[in-house]
Amino acid sequence: MNIFLKKPLHPILIGKIGKAYGILGWVKFFSFTENKEKIFSYFPWFILKKKWEIIHVDKWKKHNNNFIIHIENILDRSTVSKFTNLEIFIDKSILPILKEDEYYWNDVIDCKVFNSRKEYLGKVINLIRNQNNDVLIIRNNLKKNNFKKIMIPFIHKKIVKYINVKHKIITVIWN
């Protein structure tokens, strides 16, 4: 882990700042990590305005299903409002090293997806979480200047048969 980074070498999106909360410089904050509170153990946090900047959170609290955070040295609503809708990144190097068959969501982005008949379905552009399971969002642009999004449930072994994040390939049982 390199705590002296001035910008992330391998940025990973981990959250997003919402609108101002109160008048004392607090903002709503949405964690994209699986264990939402785990986000507060990853530092430094980076934002991208015109260039990468580090932000320091000096306080945080649970608020409904998410959080409110206080950014160091910001004491009023108008100043903190400038952070609304900014995405929070960390550098991949600070994440724990995973076992061989494990991966982070961001590792799945840009994987090529094929069905069991080896037909190309598209490329993973996002993942979303719903109540039942995660969902792969795949962009299919087989026709020139025309694309569609395919949503495939991320159900290991039943629908998602094979994942190789190193070679960026996923095989699914899907028509």
Curated annotation (Swiss-Prot):
Compartments, record wording: Cytoplasm
Organism: Buchnera aphidicola subsp. Schizaphis graminum (strain Sg)
GO cellular component term of the entry, any: cytoplasm
Acyltransferase keyword on record: no
Stored InterPro entries: PRC_barrel-like_sf, PRC_RimM, RimM, RimM_N, RimM_N_sf, Transl_B-barrel_sf
One Pfam family linked to the record: RimM
Domain notes: The PRC barrel domain binds ribosomal protein uS19.
GO molecular function, one term: ribosome binding
Keywords from the UniProt entry: Chaperone, Cytoplasm, Ribosome biogenesis, rRNA processing
Protein name according to UniProt: Ribosome maturation factor RimM
Gene (UniProt): rimM
A GO BP entry: ribosomal small subunit biogenesis
